[in-house]
A protein has these predicted regions:
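Short inter-helical turns and helix N-cap capping residues of alpha-solenoid HEAT/ARM repeat scaffolds
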Residues: 45-46, 77-78, 109-110
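Positively charged n-region of N-terminal signal peptides that target proteins for export
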Residues: 1-7
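Bacterial N-terminal signal peptides
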Residues: 7-16
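Boundary at the C-terminal end of the N-terminal hydrophobic targeting segment
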Residues: 19-21
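Amphipathic alpha-helical scaffolding segments comprising HEAT/armadillo-like alpha-solenoid repeats
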Residues: 27-42, 62-74, 94-106
Length: 126
């Protein structure tokens, strides 16, 4: 009887672990789909959508967003959008992204963007 009960408990534990593992997979899958949608949104012409997507990608520290964010930082006409891109690159903190922030300090036409990038760089080195 004890052996039967012990076997039943072990099976229940194994099955419950499998259920939790499948939930994590579903959650990870949802995050990946969300990240994919944000990467699509960052390439649209809609300013609000692009800005929000850039901000969220920085919040989730998406390594896949580094190149699109660098593109925005380098070539966007809107200085607010460039600042959002720089802030997201700072949050992601990849070497390539931080290099782009350093370059913006030197070469961006806007004093405001250069100043914000300098703040992000100084803060990242603390």
């Amino acid at each position: 009887m004890k052996g039967y009960l012990l076997g039943l408990v072990v099976i229940l534990i194994l099955l419950s672990g499998e259920c939790f593992a499948s939930n994590l997979t579903k959650r990870d899958s949802a995050i990946m789909r969300g990240e994919k949608n944000l990467l699509i949104a960052i390439n649209t012409d809609n300013y609000g959508l692009k800005s929000s997507a850039a901000q969220i990608l920085g919040d989730i520290k998406s390594k896949k967003a580094v190149i699109p964010l660098m593109k925005i930082l380098k070539s966007s006409d809107d200085e607010n959008l460039r600042i959002v891109a720089a802030h997201s690159l700072y949050k992601i903190n990849s070497p390539m992204g931080m290099f782009a922030v350093r370059q913006a300090i030197r070469f961006d036409e806007s004093v405001r963007v250069r100043k914000m990038c300098l703040n992000y760089l100084v803060d990242s080195e603390k």
